[in-house]
Amino acid sequence: MNKNNIVSAGLLIIGDEILSGRTVDQNINFLAKNLSENGILLREVRVVGDFENEIIFAVNELRKKFDYVFTSGGIGPTHDDITSLSIAKAFNQDLILNEVAHKILIQHYGAENINEARLKMAYLPRKASLLDNPISSAPGFRIENVFVMAGIPKIFQAMFEASKKELKIGCKISARELKISLTESVIAKDLTDLQSQYHEISMGSYPFENGTSLVFRGFDKEILEEAFLKMQNLITKIDPKIIIEIL
């Protein structure tokens, strides 16, 4: 597999509420699965608090490393919602009143109900393009390879669905799984030896109660099946009865 064909992404989760433990993130799993379905690998997830400099630093690092960056959180009306301003500064752009976003807010709340806090949500980086948000009025946006979205899972998911048409499709990854009633330590050496033969295949070992799940992932399905069969044969030689499930 040519590495130039691999499309990668990073996720930046923004919010003190995540770091304090008050809120449990529900967006990582959704994003990872949906990106994978489009042949895009989620390669890194970072969490930062509501600090402008930290957001700017993280966004600038991630957008240089990956094809796409998704952010969640911090685009609401309160004083600690500083994502839009931070993204603007990361791109050296002014934060301006986006007329389209402003009209959306007026349609949602009514012109007489647009106070300073709500108007704040219409201020976006100068070159931002809006992401559709059919759930609420808070606008998400895209600027270059960065997609800025809400932290609330239902809204995050809706914004992602709206952004999918703008993503390039990568080479989809295949996966196989072997569940066995052995501890990791028993098969660790065999797995290490096999991994050294197949550098293009990701081999993971994940313990559960009374067993281990071996997960093989790769872009080349033929090579993946070859490596997986070798592992299966190694386990069978130990004792075929220890195989719980093959997926």
Where would I find each of the regions flagged by the language model?
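An accessory alpha-helical subdomain
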Residues: 145-236
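N-terminal small/polar loop signature for handling phosphorylated ligands or for N-terminal nucleophile
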Residues: 29-82, 86-89
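Proline/glycine-rich low-complexity loops and linkers
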Residues: 54-57, 64, 82-168
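Glycine-rich phosphate/diphosphate-binding loop of Rossmann-like nucleotide-binding domains
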Residues: 2-45, 50, 225
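Short proline/glycine- and acidic-rich turn/helix-capping motifs at secondary-structure junctions
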Residues: 181-185, 242-247
